[in-house]
Amino acid sequence: MNELKQTWKTMLSEFQDQAELKQDQLFVLGCSTSEVAGSRIGTSGSVDIAESIYSGLAELREKTGIHLAFQCCEHLNRALVVEAETAKLFRLPTVSAVPVPKAGGAMASYAFKQMKSPVLVETIQADAGIDIGDTFIGMHLKPVAVPVRVSQNSLGSAHVTLARTRPKLIGGVRAVYECE
């Protein structure tokens, strides 16, 4: 577990170096703790793995002031666990469900228990996110998603994809994108 925590800490540090997350930005995590442990997604969730991943993100939140969203599994239609204040700030309508390990996933249910005032929302448009175990967070990212590459592309046995977003470049040949 110590190796997992160290890998995760390094991954988050490298991600922040590139994504440059700022206060009040929205971050989404999709995570299969089963995949991290080497099993097929949805088959053997782990509270211990969820705790390790959550603690790293809690540190990132403290350093940056970002808002965290934890994607549930497909049994809850990939709804997201957020703090009630996050839902209010981003004007996100809530939905009625409480994630549990077998319907929501180990990661989302762990996050729900750790938060001060957790709620579920159906969808968000996050500024950045990390997908651990191919949980498909793309539906919750703003357009345009930009891949972020870090020194490792796996956590435990799970494949990891990292992304930040950028504003759309609009206009034509005469458009200017940087101030002179």
UniProtKB/Swiss-Prot annotation:
It holds the Pfam family DUF436. Coiled coil: none annotated. SUPFAM superfamilies: TTHA0583/YokD-like. Induction: Negatively regulated by TnrA under nitrogen-limited conditions. Belongs to the UPF0340 family. This is UPF0340 protein YwlG. It comes from Bacillus subtilis (strain 168).
